[in-house]
Structures are given as C-alpha cells and as structure tokens.
C-alpha cells in the first residue's frame, strides 16, 4: 500500500480550505458532512459556498492567503487554480506538521479524499492513490448498487443494542454468531423493507431466545428454534437482466429456493444464487406445469421450513402476474413476504420499440387489458376500448389476434387504427410487426412471430418507424414492394 486507509474524526475540528470555487466547494461539502468546522479563505467565493456558510459552524475570511491562517488547523486543503499559491500552502503546512491536501496534485498530498459510499455509520472509502480517480469512482458506483440504503439504519440498531448483547452473550464467538444471524436473516430484511420497529423487535426477540438458551446451558445451535423463512415475490422484468432492480438482484442472490415462471429469461435466472434450488413452475395459457394453488403451497411449505424463498415472475408481479393471489395465500398462512416490482412487459415493449404509450398528439390515456379471463374464456369487453385517443395494451393476446381485432372493429374502432405486435420485448430476439386492425392478421399469418408477445393498439403505434432504436422490425409486404419499385 502506498497510503494507509484510516478514518479521521473531524467533528468540531478546525479545517482550512484555501479557495472559493467549485473545487473548494466539493471538498467543503464532504468535510461539512463529517462535522468539521470549516474556514474558507478566499477573496471571492461561489454561490454554492455562500449557501454552505449558512451553517454557523463555518467561517469566511475574504482575504488573500497568509500562512497565519493555517495556525491551529487540524487539516488544510488547497483548492485554488494558482499553482504557485498551492505550492506555498503545501510548504507552510509541512513546516508546521499540519496535514495538507493540494487538490488534484498527488505529490503534494499528505492524505487523499477517497470515493465514498456513505451508509452512515457504515462508510466505505475507495482510493487509487491518485492514479485513476475515474476508476475509483466507477468502483464506488458498483458498490452503491450492491449495498442497500438500509445498512446504515441496521448498523445504528446494532450500535444501540451492542452493550445489551455483550451483557447477555459473554463470549466473543457467541456474539459473532448472534450478529451473523441477525445481519443475514429476518432482522436485516425487515430493516431493508422500511419496517424498523419490527426489525428492532425481532432483534430483541432473537437476543432473548439466545440468552435463555445460554442460561439453561444448552447448545445454542441445537436449541435454536427453527425460524420461519420469508417469501420474496420478485418481478423479473421483461427479460433483459440489466432491467432488474437492485433490490430484486439482492434478494435473488440470497435465496435458498427459487420458483420461476416460463417468462423468466435464462439470463435473469443465471443471476440467482448459484447453489439455490431452482424449480420451474411455469404457466402458458392453459398449460400449467404446476397449478396456482400448488405454487402457493410450495412457497408456504418452503418458508415454513425456514427457507428464504424467491418467487420469480416475468414482468411485474401485480400486472397480470397473479402476485395478489399469492400474497393472499401467504398472509393467510402467516408467512412474511415482500413484493419487489419489475418493469412490466408494456413498459419494456413501449420503450424498446419507440412507441410511447401516451403522447400529447395521439393518446391521453392508456389501458392494460388481458386477452383471457380467469375462466380461460376470451375477454370480450370491447365496447370500453373504442376511444381513439386511448392506447390499449393486450397481454396474452397473440393467440386470439383475429378475435381481438375483429372485436375492436365491430365495437366501433376504425379499421385503420395502427397496431403493433412486439415479440420478446427487450431481448436480442425482439421483433416488431406493425399494421392496422384491418390487415395485421394477414401479415402475421404470412410471417408469424413467436411468443411471448404483446399488442399495442392506437395511434401511437405508427411512431415505431420513426422512433425505433432497438431490435429488428418485420418489414411488411407493402413496404417491400415499395422499396423494390424505388430501385
């Protein structure tokens, strides 16, 4: 190591920043968050530093630099665009053994400002020793995606209970095991879900159980009652793994067992914890690998045995995903659960095809419709879908394309209404076919698209040719003929 990483207490400590511009302001913001009492020394300062000075801890000296100003300071930062002045500040500080940082000049720095991941009181600093600041920043960005915001609250709770835990669990090994269980289980998930009161109650309950086991001289591991697990209903999005949420990825990587649908892509499934059991419970129209009631019971049984269960569903769990039915069953069984939203197929199909679902010139509302009812019968509520200024999205509608288009036209929607079929939205295999209600059936019969597919009906569909940016567009025969005639 060229530098030693340590954390420096600056609360109420005097710090001098020489400079009043953007560079000085960035350092001042960081030091202010650490509780330092900052003196800004500069003839002129930026508006941002003016705002910083509203904090009564901080002081402004509108003067040119003089070495008298560094006397008594804990650290000094030189952040001016005057190279000679920065060297002078460095020399004066070295003479008085005051740590100094000359911004963006590593040879003149006694210490370096790291890239910071702040989950106070959990703080991570990343440094490249001035060799590659951009790489340090990118490393920080990656860590930001991996560490939940709730880590800070979890650490504060642990700090508040540290003395009580120490008094009830006398051995270091016992305390380590206690905290590992708390940080890897129910307590942490409650905190991450924003249920801090319940998290504290769960931690106290865990402590009391452990204390009772120790008091009775029983083996903690043998006497530990089997804990009830939890179920995470996770939206896997439309297929592109980069469209997963951070929370979805975190829960997928700590699951003991994963029940996944047919619409979950292999790329997404591969991101689950490697040693988790992965069980296919897919459903395609009336062909169900496992009936819904059976899926509910599988989740209940697994969670009751103490497992962390991920129910991985394509798209969003609450948009034609039967997530509501599943959590009703979990609630009735007394199983704890969380629901993690995913990007629904309509959102992905819209964005990945350049077809906005709403547009001030074409559509002021949007309606999501399923092609089939609970009974398995086709949805026939076409009378409510005739507004020309409304976009209609049909999920699971490709197999009944002819019935849907005829129903819309019979109900009064213009035969010239644009329609788009989007197959495998967001994936490298995405395909798009456009047409009108009157001709889309013939086009699809001539060049059928694979499922899963979604239908977008409305004037916005005609924007695809203009705004498309991703994947392959199926050229219709009229366009091909026109193109040949132009040769």
From Swiss-Prot:
Q: Give the modified residues of type Phosphoserine.
A: 128
Q: Which reaction does it catalyse?
A: uroporphyrinogen III + 2 S-adenosyl-L-methionine = precorrin-2 + 2 S-adenosyl-L-homocysteine + H(+); precorrin-2 + NAD(+) = sirohydrochlorin + NADH + 2 H(+); siroheme + 2 H(+) = sirohydrochlorin + Fe(2+)
Q: Which one Pfam family would you cite for this protein?
A: CysG_dimeriser
Q: Identify the metabolic or biological route this protein is part of.
A: Cofactor biosynthesis; adenosylcobalamin biosynthesis; precorrin-2 from uroporphyrinogen III: step 1/1; Cofactor biosynthesis; adenosylcobalamin biosynthesis; sirohydrochlorin from precorrin-2: step 1/1; Porphyrin-containing compound metabolism; siroheme biosynthesis; precorrin-2 from uroporphyrinogen III: step 1/1; Porphyrin-containing compound metabolism; siroheme biosynthesis; siroheme from sirohydrochlorin: step 1/1
GO BP annotations listed = cobalamin biosynthetic process; methylation; siroheme biosynthetic process
Please give the CDD domains that the UniProt record associates with this protein: SUMT
Q: InterPro entries given for it?
A: 4pyrrol_Mease, 4pyrrol_Methylase_sf, 4pyrrole_Mease_sub1, 4pyrrole_Mease_sub2, CobA/CysG_C, NAD(P)-bd_dom_sf, Siro_Cobalamin_biosynth, Sirohaem_synt_dimer_dom_sf
Q: What is its EC number?
A: 2.1.1.107, 1.3.1.76, 4.99.1.4
Keyword annotations from UniProtKB, A to Z:
Cobalamin biosynthesis, Lyase, Methyltransferase, Multifunctional enzyme, NAD, Oxidoreductase, Phosphoprotein, Porphyrin biosynthesis, S-adenosyl-L-methionine, Transferase
**Chain segments carrying region Uroporphyrinogen-III C-methyltransferase:** 229-487
Record keywords: Lyase included?
Answer: yes
Q: Where is the active site?
A: 261, 283
- Which stretches of sequence are listed as region Precorrin-2 dehydrogenase /sirohydrochlorin ferrochelatase? 1-203
**Similarity comment:** In the N-terminal section; belongs to the precorrin-2 dehydrogenase / sirohydrochlorin ferrochelatase family. In the C-terminal section; belongs to the precorrin methyltransferase family.
What the entry lists under PANTHER family is as follows: SIROHEME SYNTHASE, SIROHEME SYNTHASE-RELATED
Q: Which NCBIfam families match?
A: cobA_cysG_Cterm (TIGR01469), cysG_Nterm (TIGR01470), PRK06136.1 (NF004790), PRK10637.1 (NF007922)
The molecule here is called Siroheme synthase
* Name of the gene: cysG
